[in-house]
Regions:
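Non-catalytic pre-domain segments flanking phosphatase-related domains
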Residues: 1-7, 224-230
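N-terminal helical cap/lid subdomain that shapes the substrate entry/recognition surface
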Residues: 2-96, 101, 105
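Conserved H-loop
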Residues: 34, 129-134, 162, 206
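A short, structured active-site edge motif that brings together acidic residues
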Residues: 40-42, 71, 130-144
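Substrate-recognition element of Asp-dependent hydrolases with the DxDx(T/V) motif
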Residues: 98-125
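Conserved Lys-Pro-Asp/Glu-containing loop-to-beta segment of HAD-superfamily phosphomonoesterases
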Residues: 146-176
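Acidic, Mg2+-coordinating phosphoryl-transfer loop and its flanking beta/alpha structural elements
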Residues: 168-207
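Short acidic-hydrophobic, aromatic-tinged amphipathic segments that line or gate anion-handling sites
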Residues: 206-214
Length: 230
């Protein structure tokens, strides 16, 4: 049975907030929305995805949100985002070394994100870490998004693992709810977008990581309970 570590992407592997905000502002500019997202004020919105970014602009500009307009604008947002996807996005400190450690120790790696798979593939290639992952799953892979547990459970199954031989690493309440529904051990990354910019009860899990090296230590601790591979 394979041992597996699965990661969220935005706010977990990389700080992507500024490029998401910029894509939102460029989208707003094209359609005549005057509101502009700002890093310090709106960074937390970006951690919720492109649609939430659009909703913020519509709400602030019009005072209400037209969900049909959100859906109509989303493809435009994605096209714009692809053009700026790595202008400012960077891996968190220690992420590359963490991935190298896991690969060298025969732990298979996957990504389970709410970013569409095309954009996830582009970003991971731009960041130079795409080749570390055996599988990359977005909301369009199985036609459902986190916190539905299906994307995570299918990722585990495709990697030849079980929930007891898997850890899931994320930074948002959505990630936590996904792992809870799937009954997969969850490592909460304390330096990601979700914890910093959203209200989050960190007592939801005993596994709290303040650095990439702590993710390694906690993963070993969890998986050693079930598998003697170190």
């Amino acid at each position: 049975m394979n041992s597996v570590a699965i990661f969220d992407l935005d706010g977990t592997l990389a700080d992507t907030a500024l490029d998401l905000l910029n894509a939102g502002n460029l989208t707003f500019e094209e359609i005549g929305i005057n509101y502009r997202l700002k890093e310090n004020r709106d960074e937390g919105i970006s951690s919720k995805g492109g649609r939430s970014t659009i909703r913020q602009g519509l709400l602030q500009d019009n005072g209400f949100i037209d969900e049909q307009l959100v859906e109509n604008l989303y493809p435009k947002f994605l096209k714009i985002y692809e053009k700026v996807i790595d202008d400012n996005s960077v891996l968190y400190e220690g992420t590359l070394e963490m991935l190298e450690y896991f690969k060298n120790n025969k732990i298979q790696l996957g990504v389970c994100t709410n970013k569409p798979k095309k954009q996830a593939d582009i970003l991971l290639n731009k960041l130079g870490i795409h080749s570390f992952f055996e599988i990359i799953v977005g909301p369009d892979t199985y036609n459902c998004a986190k916190p539905n547990p299906k994307p995570l459970l299918n990722t585990i199954d495709n990697l030849g693992a079980t929930i007891k031989s898997t850890v899931f690493v994320g930074d948002t309440n959505t990630d936590y709810m996904t792992s809870k529904s799937a009954k997969v051990p969850f490592i909460l990354l304390l330096y990601g977008h979700g914890v910093i910019h959203q209200s989050f009860d960190t007592s939801c899990t005993p596994y709290l990581a303040k650095s990439a090296s702590e993710i390694i230590d906690i993963t070993i601790k969890i998986l050693k309970k079930y598998w003697n591979f170190f």
